[in-house]
C-alpha cells in the first residue's frame, strides 16, 4: 500500500516509542512443498450446440489457483472418461494423479444438468459425487460451485471460487481526458461489469460484509468523498464530505460501522462512523500519517499503516481507546495490512532492508516469520480471499498496471485477465452464499 501513502500526500498537495524486533522474526523467501496432482477430465456434453464455457477447465483453474493442487495437462491424459463406470484407475496412477474428477453435462428442458464425481486414485474410492443445474449462461457459476464443493471436501476449507472482485480501471485518451471505471468481476477476472464510470479518480473500493453494498472514494467535483453504493440498484449515498482528505473506507465485520481516514483535524488519522447514527469517533492521533484501516474479526481491533516511527509499519489499536501497538518489525516498509480468515496471517506490502522492490508478503502472527509471496517489483493494494488461500494485488508489467493472483503458499503466481488501460485497487468480496 505504498500507493495509498503516496496518494494521500498527492491529495493533500493537490488540495492546497517502538519496540525492538524479536529474535524469532525471520524472513523466508522460498516456497513450500509441491501441490497435489489432480486430473479434471473434460466434461462430457450430450447436446448439439457448442457450450459457451469449458467447465472442466474452469474447475481445473480454480483448484490450481488455490495453490493446493497441480492439474494434470489434458495432453497427458491416457483416457478421458465422463462417468464413474468408465474410469480405469491404472491410467491415472500412471500419470501420477492423486485425485480424479469426471463429469457429464446433459440438456434438460432448456436447462443443463451437470453430474460430477471426484475420486481418490490411490484407494479407487469416490470422495464426492453431486449434481447441479442451471442455464448455459450460468456455466461459470456452476463450475465455481463444483470447485467450492470439491475444495472443501478435500481440504476442510470452504472454497472461495464463487466470490467476486472489485477493481478500478483508468484509460487515458488525452492529457485532460481519462476515464475511470469501477468494475466487478468473478474472482478470476471473468465477466466484468461496470458499476460506476467517472472522469475523476475512483479509489479504495470495498465490499460490505453482506456483499450487497460497496464503499469507495470518488473525486467528483474535484475533491475526495466517500460514497456507499448498492450493487443491484446502483443507488448510492455520500457518506463523508469533510475538509481535506476523505479516504480508505473499511467496513466493520458486522457492517454497522465504517472506518476511514480524515485529515480535517490536521494529519491524516483513522475515524469510525456508526452507520445508523452517522456519528464519528477518532481512533488515532499524534504525528505522522495513519491510514489503511482493516478490522479484526472481534470488531474492536483495527490494523493500520503508520509512519509515526519514521517509516511505514503496521500497527493495531482498539477502536474504543488506548495506545497503538506495532505489529511489523522485519523490513523498512510494511503497509496495506490484511488479515487471513483465521487471523493467523497478516498480508501486506513489504520492502526488505537494502532493497527497493515492493512485494506482497505474509507474516505469521504467532511466530513472527515473514514470507515473500511475489516476484514482481512494484506491488500494491493486496486483497485476501475470504478463506485466506489466495491474494490478488496490483503491480506493473510492461509499463501497465495489472492485477496478479498469488496463492498464500506461494506456489501459484499468474496475471488476471482485465480490461484495457491501467488496472488497480483490487478488493475481494466476502462469501456470497
Swiss-Prot record:
GO terms for biological process: cell division; protein import. The keyword Transcription regulation does not apply. Part of the Tol-Pal system, which plays a role in outer membrane invagination during cell division and is important for maintaining outer membrane integrity. Keywords: Cell cycle, Cell division, Periplasm, Signal. The Tol-Pal system is composed of five core proteins: the inner membrane proteins TolA, TolQ and TolR, the periplasmic protein TolB and the outer membrane protein Pal. They form a network linking the inner and outer membranes and the peptidoglycan layer. It comes from Pseudomonas fluorescens (strain SBW25). Belongs to the TolB family. Its main location: periplasm. Residues 1-21 form the signal peptide. It holds the Pfam family TolB_N. This is Tol-Pal system protein TolB. One of its GO terms (cellular component) is periplasmic space.
Amino acid at each position: 500500500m505504498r500507493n495509498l501513502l503516496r496518494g494521500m500526500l498527492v491529495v493533500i498537495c493537490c488540495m492546497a516509542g517502538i519496540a525492538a524486533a524479536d529474535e524469532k522474526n525471520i524472513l523466508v523467501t522460498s516456497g513450500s512443498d509441491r501441490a497435489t496432482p489432480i486430473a479434471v477430465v473434460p466434461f462430457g456434453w450430450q447436446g448439439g450446440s457448442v457450450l459457451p464455457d469449458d467447465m472442466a477447465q474452469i474447475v481445473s483453474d480454480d483448484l490450481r489457483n488455490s495453490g493446493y493442487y497441480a492439474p494434470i495437462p489434458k495432453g497427458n491424459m491416457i483416457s478421458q472418461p465422463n462417468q464413474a463406470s468408465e474410469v480405469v484407475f491404472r491410467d491415472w496412477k500412471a500419470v501420477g494423479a492423486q485425485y480424479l474428477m469426471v463429469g457429464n453435462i446433459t440438456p434438460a428442458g432448456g436447462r443443463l444438468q451437470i453430474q460430477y464425481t471426484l475420486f481418490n486414485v490411490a484407494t479407487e474410492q469416490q470422495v464426492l459425487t453431486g449434481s447441479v443445474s442451471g442455464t448455459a449462461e450460468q456455466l461459470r457459476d456452476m463450475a465455481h460451485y463444483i470447485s467450492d464443493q470439491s475444495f472443501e471436501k478435500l481440504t476442510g476449507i470452504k472454497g472461495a471460487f464463487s466470490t467476486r472482485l472489485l477493481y478500478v480501471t483508468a484509460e487515458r485518451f488525452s492529457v485532460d481526458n481519462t476515464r475511470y471505471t469501477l468494475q466487478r468481476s468473478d474472482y478470476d477476472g471473468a465477466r466484468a461489469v461496470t458499476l460506476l464510470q467517472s472522469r475523476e479518480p475512483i479509489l479504495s473500493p470495498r465490499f460490505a460484509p453482506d456483499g450487497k453494498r460497496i464503499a469507495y472514494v470518488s473525486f467528483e467535483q474535484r475533491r475526495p468523498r466517500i460514497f456507499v453504493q448498492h450493487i443491484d440498484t446502483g443507488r448510492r449515498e455520500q457518506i463523508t464530505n469533510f475538509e481535506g482528505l476523505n479516504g480508505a473506507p473499511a467496513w466493520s465485520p458486522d457492517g454497522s460501522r465504517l472506518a476511514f481516514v480524515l485529515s480535517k483535524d490536521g494529519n491524516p488519522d483513522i475515524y469510525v462512523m456508526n452507520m445508523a447514527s452517522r456519528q464519528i469517533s477518532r481512533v488515532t492521533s499524534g504525528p505522522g500519517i495513519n491510514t489503511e484501516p482493516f478490522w479484526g474479526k472481534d470488531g474492536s481491533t483495527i490494523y493500520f499503516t503508520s509512519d509515526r516511527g519514521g517509516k511505514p509499519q503496521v500497527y493495531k489499536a482498539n477502536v474504543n481507546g488506548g495506545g497503538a501497538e506495532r505489529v511489523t518489525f522485519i523490513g523498512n516498509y510494511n503497509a496495506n495490512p490484511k488479515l487471513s480468515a483465521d487471523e493467523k496471517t497478516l498480508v501486506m506490502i513489504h520492502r526488505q532492508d537494502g532493497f527497493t522492490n515492493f512485494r506482497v508478503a505474509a507474516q505469521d502472527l504467532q511466530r513472527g516469520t515473514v514470507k515473500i509471496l511475489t516476484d514482481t517489483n512494484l506491488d500494491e493494494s493486496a486483497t485476501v480471499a475470504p478463506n485466506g488461500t489466495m491474494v490478488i494485488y496490483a503491480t506493473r508489467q510492461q509499463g501497465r498496471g495489472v492485477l496478479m493472483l498469488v496463492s498464500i503458499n506461494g506456489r501459484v503466481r499468474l496475471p488476471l485477465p482485465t480490461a484495457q488501460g491501467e488496472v488497480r485497487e483490487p478488493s475481494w468480496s466476502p462469501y456470497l452464499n
